[in-house]
Structure formats: structure tokens, C-alpha cells
């Protein structure tokens, strides 16, 4: 492809410029006598020539003949190679044979006018056709240049399209790669999110499990602390250091575990992690009782009653009443009291102890002194009795308990040991903290409560010490164990009018409680606990400004049972001070408990109790009525709902049935219509088939009639032909018969005549065979030829084999008739005569 435009000689170029165009020498006519080959056509050299190019422009051009370059100052034409598109045809032309190359416009004329021979060559510089050839060559160069430019444009456009496609493909690949990377990134992010969510769920699950475990541990710790506190009630008294009771008593009754020296903690942790009842009731009692003297003294002091129990008991006056009630009502349902705890120091295991399932020992502390350590006189005035009355004190409680004690002793050793191990471990961990808490709780209220409860009697220090125990309002309601022990510890009072009236009242109360309670054994303990809780809630208001009673672990009972257990305990308060044998020091102790005990009138208490019971009964009746009404409303609503659902279901079923029936009817109607349509189609098809059969039958009849008619016509023609043939044959036979008769008469041998006869018959049969293909109807048996074939047999050979006939002349005639050929245009009379005669002859032969 050229780098710049080419200058082409115009039509008016001078001859000098044209002469300077390099020309190749032509072969001389002398050197090469053979004429030059014809020039190669332009179409073979220039394939891109448009079809509408004139013939003058399609002459052969030399690839070396190029236009002038603009940079050539001399005006010479520089050779330039042709484009590759134009070389291929030239190579094809070269392969065909040597072709003369056009060297300039001088040779263009001879190549164009090769068909016209010219004797002389005209010079190019002088003749005007040379100028025309130069002009045409310029036009050809111009067209070639245009074609090259178009080709270049086409290639450029093609290359641009190809580059555009490449760019599009590259962009598509980039887009696909980006999309793939994006999807991979999204998948990775989703996987990370799922993994993070899974880790978060696992972490939350672990946290929940951890919280649940911690909550379970805390609950177990709280339960353990509750058990520890309930157990420590039996030996960890809450008496203050400066309590006058310790100074006046001078005995071990007021000693508390909190007031022990520091070196005793290890012994308490090891030996006294449980209550005294559990300790004395353990299976290894013989081994555990082998203590040193100092340890035995500690155990004895812990086993003795303390004044903290009086603070928890609310009043020293109510204790004998509850004690007598417990003493009379002790049985299988009653828990063992502290009175038997004193006897447990005797040899042999004491049977009446805390039930193993209670998980806590006997909470209350007996008011009596230990048998080893008798109490002093001031304390025995209101708690103890002389040693001579102790056997009488133990008898009422021990009357109905040996069987229960044996059952408990048989069922408890393993459970007690397990509970002992568990509590020992918990005690080792929490004993120090428990002592500090108990000490703080015991020392929190004495200063504010003591002035309110102070009196002028000798027991006023004890009265001050009673509310000082924080377990009165804080820990006592949480104890699952009743406190019937003081009643057994106090000595029985001598019979008195008021005492005797109080006992039946207690019996009546116990009977009512037994009637109201669902179970025979457990409800009494529950009633005692409820009565204690109710007593503490009511009197605690003047003593403590803001007490926080701990809820009882037992399920809450109705208000009627609480009131029934509360009121008789309050009414029994004034009964004890009026006893004649009661010490005079017990009388002032009633005064601080009166404002806390409620009403002192028995009738008023009975009336209040009846009123409360009536209100509770009315409340229950109202609640029951409301429950019934609500149940009726719910039942009615349910019934209405069920009725509506049933109606809706029935409507749906009826609608479904109607739809099914309608569908069945429509289906049956459609089937009937289909059957009718099929039947109609079948009938129409049958009618059409009958019509077609009738038409075919008629056509067959017509065809048969036509054939019959044609047969009749053929028979008539045949009869006519036979008539004409038989007429001539009859004449010949007559002549021949005459000759034979003459010969017979002359005496020739008849056998010879018979032998000579078949030759003529054979000749006639051959003629008949030649005529048979022309008339195929003759070979078939028909009514026209009764003598030719009868039942498929030809009678002629039978006559020939026999050699004679019954009538010689007739037989010869019959043989001659059947064997001879048919002759056209003969008379018909002889044939008719023969036809009439022939059937009898055949019958005779057969």
C-alpha cells in the first residue's frame, strides 16, 4: 500500500513524458517467428474490476506500469509493486503460459485491436489513438487506486470491527471475572457471617448454661445456708454479750456458739456442723461420743437450752400452753421434742429424733436444764422443775412414740450419713461467714427494742433479751420445723379450774384442725408453723418498726386455718398466771405479751374466729360461684362454637353433596349425549354402508347385465360364423362320404380307410388349434357347443379309440365335424343339422 498519493498522467500528457516510461523490449519478428500468444484478459489480472466497467477499461495492464511519484523531479515513473490482491490472478495467468507484458501505452493499442490485423505499426508519439490509450491507462490507474483505497477502507473497517469485538470480549471477560470474584467474596462473607453467628449462638448458649449453672449453684448455696441457719438454731443462740441473763444465771444455759473462744471453731466445724439431734442420732454415735473432757463440756453447753429460744418463742407464758397441747397430742404425726433430747445422753440411741427427710434437725430448744448440768434457782422458777419431776415430764411425750421411733431409726442411717457429709463440707466453707452474719443480725435490734419491752419484774432482763434475737422476726418463719419443745420441757401444772378448761379448748382446737387438715400427720405441723407465723406477724408490729418476715417453706394455707391456729394460742395466754402453783415471778411476764397477743376475751376470739371463718366461707362460695358461672359461660361458648362449627360443617357437606350430585347429573347427561351421538353416528354409518352396498350391487348387476349382453352378442356372432362355416363343411363331408362309400363298396381294406382317416382329422385339429387363440370363448364349455365337451370330456377321442360308431355314417360325420377346422363364410344349415343330431350321439357313447 502506498504511503502517499500518486500522480497519474492525464489525457493531455506530452509524448516526451510517455516516452520516458520504461518499456520492456518486445521480441523481434525475426528472432521469434511464432506469432505472440493472445493477451491475457483484464478479468484474470484485475479481480476487483466492477461488473459495470466498460470493455475498454478491462484490457491487460502491467503490474510494473505505475503512475508517477510526486517526489520525482524528473517526472519519471517509478515502478511499484501491485497489491497482493492483484498478484494472485497474474500468477494464475503465468501458470497457464507465457503472456506478453504490456510495457507502455504503445502496446495497449495492439492488445486491444488484436482481433483486427494491421500491416503497419503507427508511432505512439504521432498517432491520436496513443493519447486515448494513455487516457484510458490513467483511468485504469485511477480505478485501481480507488479500488485499493476501498480495499484499505474495508480492511480498516474490518480491523476496527475486529478490535471492537476484541474489546467487547475482553470487557465481557473482565465483567465475568469481577462477577465471579464478587460472588466468591459474597460467599466468603456469608460463610464468615454464618460462622460468626454460629460462634455467637455457641457463646450465648455457653453463657446461658453458665448462668444456669451459677443460678443452680446459688440456689443450692442458698438452700444450704437456709439449712445451716435452721440447724444452727438448735445450738447457736442469739444472746447478746451484755445480757443480764448470763450474769444472773451463772450457768451454761445461755452459752452460744458465737460466744465460744476462737480455738473452738475447728471443733465446731468438725463435730457440730449438724444439730445435736443429728449428732446423737447418727449411726456412729458410740465413736463420735468418745470425746475429751473439754469437748464434752462444749457439747454439754451446746445441748443445754439458751435464752435465745425464749426470744423466738414470743412469750414465756405461751410455752406451757403449747407444751401441754403438744404433750397430749403427741403421736405418730408429732415431731419429737427437745424434752427427749435430755434423755438422749443416757446410754443407748434415742429413737425420737428428727425425721431424715426434713433435712434439718429439731429447731426448738427445751427450757429444761441438761441432766448433767442443773440450772440455777432464778431460771428454774419459770423454766425448770426439781429433778424429782423430770420422769413425769418425759412420760407424756414418750407414751405413743416407740413404734414411730423404731421406724425412723430403721429408715434413716444412710440418709443421715449422706446429709451429714454434705453439711460438713458446706459448713467448712461457710461457717465463718455464717457466724459473722448471725452476730450482726443478733446485735442489730437490741438497743431499739429493749426499752419497749422493759418491765419492773425480775424477768425483765429476760424479756429484754427475747426480742433481741433477730431470728424472732427474720429467721423463725423460714424454719420448716415447729417449736413444740417448750411444752414438754415445762413441768405439768397442778389441776386448776382454768387449766382444766384450757385443755378441752386445746383438744377442740386440735380436733377442728384435724378435720380441716387433709392428712393425719403432716397438717398439725403445718398448723403449728402457721400459728407461729401469724403470732410473729401480729405482735412484731410494736416491737420492730419494719420487720421483713420470711415466707414459710410450706405451701400457703387458707385464711381460715391460720386464724383457727392463731386465736386459741392467744386465748390460752391468761390461763397460766392464774395457776395457784405458778411462781409469783411469772405474773409480770404476762403484761408485755398482752398488747401483742390480740384480744383476751374468749367469746370475742370465738366470735372473731367464727366471723373470719364465715367470711372465708363466703369468699370461697363466691369464688366457687364465679368459677361455676365462668365454667358455664365457657361451656356455653364452647357448645355454641361447636354448634356453629357443626352447622358450618353440615353446610359444607351439603354443598359438597349438591356439587357432587350436580356433577354426577352433568356427567350422566354428558355420557347420555355422547352415547346418543355415537348411536347416531353408528346409524348414519350403517345407512351409508347400506347405500354403498346397494350402489355396488346395482353396479354389479349393471355390469353383469352388460357382460351378459356382450356375451349374447358374441354368441350370436359366433353362431353366425358357425353357420357359415358348417355350411361349406357339410358340402365337403358329403363329397368325402360319397367317396368312402364308393371305396368301401369296391372292396378296399376298412382298416386302411380308418387309418387314413386320422391324418385328415389331425390336420383339422391343428387348424382348430390355430384358430383357438383368436376366439378364447371356444375353449370353454358353453351352451352353444353341446357336443364339444361334456363334463370336461371330449367325445372325439373316444370314437377314435373305439374305431367304430353305432352308426358308421353318423360316427364319421361326428368325427369329421369335431376334428375339422372352421371355415368362414359357409352355409349355416349343415351346422344347425349337426347341432341338433350331436347330443344323442354323445349320450350313446357315454
Curated annotation (Swiss-Prot):
The modification Phosphothreonine is found at residues 49, 53, 99, 120, 554, 818. GO terms for biological process: microtubule cytoskeleton organization. It is found in: Cytoplasm, Cytoskeleton, Spindle; Cytoplasm, Cytoskeleton; Cytoplasm, Cytoskeleton, Microtubule organizing center, Centrosome; Midbody. Residues 132-153, 407-437, 523-539, 600-740 have a biased composition (Basic and acidic residues). It comes from the Eukaryota. Signal peptide: none annotated. Residues 1-153, 186-210, 318-816 are annotated as: Disordered. The modification Phosphoserine is found at residues 95, 115, 118, 125, 127, 256, 275, 315, 368, 401, 444, 448, 454, 460, 479, 496, 544, 548, 552. Residues 130-224, 414-443, 599-740 form a coiled coil. Keywords: Coiled coil, Cytoplasm, Cytoskeleton, Isopeptide bond, Phosphoprotein, Ubl conjugation. Its main location: cytoplasm. Residues 113-123, 460-471, 568-579 have a biased composition (Low complexity). Residues 24-41, 479-497, 542-556 have a biased composition (Pro residues). InterPro entries: MAP7_domain-containing, MAP7_fam. One of its GO terms (cellular component) is microtubule cytoskeleton. There is a cross-link at residue 462 (Glycyl lysine isopeptide (Lys-Gly) (interchain with G-Cter in SUMO2)). Microtubule-stabilizing protein involved in the control of cell motility and neurite outgrowth. Facilitate microtubule stabilization through the maintenance of acetylated stable microtubules. Belongs to the MAP7 family. This is MAP7 domain-containing protein 1. It comes from Mus musculus (Mouse).
Amino acid at each position: 500500500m502506498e504511503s502517499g498519493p500518486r500522480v497519474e498522467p492525464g489525457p493531455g500528457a506530452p509524448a516526451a513524458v510517455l516516452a520516458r516510461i520504461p518499456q520492456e523490449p518486445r521480441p523481434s519478428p525475426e528472432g521469434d517467428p511464432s506469432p505472440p500468444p493472445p493477451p491475457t484478459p483484464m478479468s484474470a489480472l484485475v479481480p476487483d474490476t466492477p461488473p459495470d466497467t466498460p470493455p475498454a477499461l478491462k484490457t491487460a495492464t502491467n503490474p510494473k506500469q505505475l503512475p508517477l511519484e510526486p517526489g520525482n523531479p524528473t517526472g519519471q515513473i517509478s515502478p511499484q509493486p501491485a497489491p497482493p490482491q492483484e498478484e494472485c490472478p497474474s500468477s494464475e495467468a503465468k501458470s497457464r503460459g507465457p503472456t506478453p507484458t504490456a510495457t507502455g501505452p504503445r502496446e495497449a493499442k495492439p492488445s486491444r485491436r488484436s482481433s483486427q490485423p494491421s500491416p503497419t505499426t503507427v508511432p505512439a508519439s504521432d498517432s491520436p489513438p496513443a493519447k486515448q490509450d494513455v487516457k484510458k491507462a490513467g483511468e485504469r490507474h485511477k480505478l485501481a487506486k480507488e479500488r485499493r483505497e476501498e480495499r484499505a477502507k474495508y480492511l480498516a473497517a474490518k480491523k476496527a470491527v475486529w478490535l471492537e469485538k476484541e474489546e467487547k470480549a475482553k470487557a465481557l471477560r473482565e465483567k465475568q471475572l469481577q462477577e465471579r470474584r464478587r460472588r466468591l467474596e459474597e460467599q466468603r462473607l456469608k460463610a464468615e457471617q454464618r460462622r460468626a453467628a454460629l460462634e455467637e449462638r455457641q457463646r450465648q448458649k455457653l453463657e446461658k448454661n453458665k448462668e444456669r449453672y451459677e443460678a443452680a449453684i446459688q440456689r443450692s448455696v442458698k438452700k444450704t445456708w437456709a439449712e445451716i441457719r435452721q440447724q444452727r438454731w438448735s445450738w447457736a443462740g442469739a444472746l447478746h454479750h451484755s445480757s443480764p441473763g448470763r450474769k444472773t444465771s451463772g450457768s451454761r444455759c445461755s452459752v452460744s456458739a458465737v460466744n465460744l473462744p476462737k480455738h473452738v471453731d475447728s471443733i465446731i466445724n468438725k463435730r457440730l456442723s449438724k444439730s445435736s439431734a443429728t449428732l446423737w442420732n447418727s449411726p456412729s454415735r458410740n465413736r463420735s461420743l468418745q470425746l475429751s473432757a473439754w469437748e464434752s463440756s462444749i457439747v454439754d453447753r451446746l445441748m443445754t437450752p439458751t435464752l435465745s429460744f425464749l426470744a423466738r418463742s414470743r412469750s414465756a407464758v405461751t410455752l406451757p400452753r403449747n407444751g401441754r397441747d403438744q404433750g397430749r397430742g403427741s403421736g405418730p404425726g408429732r415431731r419429737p421434742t427437745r424434752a427427749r433430747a435430755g434423755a438422749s445422753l443416757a446410754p443407748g440411741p434415742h429413737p425420737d429424733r428428727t425425721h431424715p427427710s426434713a433435712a434439718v434437725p429439731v429447731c426448738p430448744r427445751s427450757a429444761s436444764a441438761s441432766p448433767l448440768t442443773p440450772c440455777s434457782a432464778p431460771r428454774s422458777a419459770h423454766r425448770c422443775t426439781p429433778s424429782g419431776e423430770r420422769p413425769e415430764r418425759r412420760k407424756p411425750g414418750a407414751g405413743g412414740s416407740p413404734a414411730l421411733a423404731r421406724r425412723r431409726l430403721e429408715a434413716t442411717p444412710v440418709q443421715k450419713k449422706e446429709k451429714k457429709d454434705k453439711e460438713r463440707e458446706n459448713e467448712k466453707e461457710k461457717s465463718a461467714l455464717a457466724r459473722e452474719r448471725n452476730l450482726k443480725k443478733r446485735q442489730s435490734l437490741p438497743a431499739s427494742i429493749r426499752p419497749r419491752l422493759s418491765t419492773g419484774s425480775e424477768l425483765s432482763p429476760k424479756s429484754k433479751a427475747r426480742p433481741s434475737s433477730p431470728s424472732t422476726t427474720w429467721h423463725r418463719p423460714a424454719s420448716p420445723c415447729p417449736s413444740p419443745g417448750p411444752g414438754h420441757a415445762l413441768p405439768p401444772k397442778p389441776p386448776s379450774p382454768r387449766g382444766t378448761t384450757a385443755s378441752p379448748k386445746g383438744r377442740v382446737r386440735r380436733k377442728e384442725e384435724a378435720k380441716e387438715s387433709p392428712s393425719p400427720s403432716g397438717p398439725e405441723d403445718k398448723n403449728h408453723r402457721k400459728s407461729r407465723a401469724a403470732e410473729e406477724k401480729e405482735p412484731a408490729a410494736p416491737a420492730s418498726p419494719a420487720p421483713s418476715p420470711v415466707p414459710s417453706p410450706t405451701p400457703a394455707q387458707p385464711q381460715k386455718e391460720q386464724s383457727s391456729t392463731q386465736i386459741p394460742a392467744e386465748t390460752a395466754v391468761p390461763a397460766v398466771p392464774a395457776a395457784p402453783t405458778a411462781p409469783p415471778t411469772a405474773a409480770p411476764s404476762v403484761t408485755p405479751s398482752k398488747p401483742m397477743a390480740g384480744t383476751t376475751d374468749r367469746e370475742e376470739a370465738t366470735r372473731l374466729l367464727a366471723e373470719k371463718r364465715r367470711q372465708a366461707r363466703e369468699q370461697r362460695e363466691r369464688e366457687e360461684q364465679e368459677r361455676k358461672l365462668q365454667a358455664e359461660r365457657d361451656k356455653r361458648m364452647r357448645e355454641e362454637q361447636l354448634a356453629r362449627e357443626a352447622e358450618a360443617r353440615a353446610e359444607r357437606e351439603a354443598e359438597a353433596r349438591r356439587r357432587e350430585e350436580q356433577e354426577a347429573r352433568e356427567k350422566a347427561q354428558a355420557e347420555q349425549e355422547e352415547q346418543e351421538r355415537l348411536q347416531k353416528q353408528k346409524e348414519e354409518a350403517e345407512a351409508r354402508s347400506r347405500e354403498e352396498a346397494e350402489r355396488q350391487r346395482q353396479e354389479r348387476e349393471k355390469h353383469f347385465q352388460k357382460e351378459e349382453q356382450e356375451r349374447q352378442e358374441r354368441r350370436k356372432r359366433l353362431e353366425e360364423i358357425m353357420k357359415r362355416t358348417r355350411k361349406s363343411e357339410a358340402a365337403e363331408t358329403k363329397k368325402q362320404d360319397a367317396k368312402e362309400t364308393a371305396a368301401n363298396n369296391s372292396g378296399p381294406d376298412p382298416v386302411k380307410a380308418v387309418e387314413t382317416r386320422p391324418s385328415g382329422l389331425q390336420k383339422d385339429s391343428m387348424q382348430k388349434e390355430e384358430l383357438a387363440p383368436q376366439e378364447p370363448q371356444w375353449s370353454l364349455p358353453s351352451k352353444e357347443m353341446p357336443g364339444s365337451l361334456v363334463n370336461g370330456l371330449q367325445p372325439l377321442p373316444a370314437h377314435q379309440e373305439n374305431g367304430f360308431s353305432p352308426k358308421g355314417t353318423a360316427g364319421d360325420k361326428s368325427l369329421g365335424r369335431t376334428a375339422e377346422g372352421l371355415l368362414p363364410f359357409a352355409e349355416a344349415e349343415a351346422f344347425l343339422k349337426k347341432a341338433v343330431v350331436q347330443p344323442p350321439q354323445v349320450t350313446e357313447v357315454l
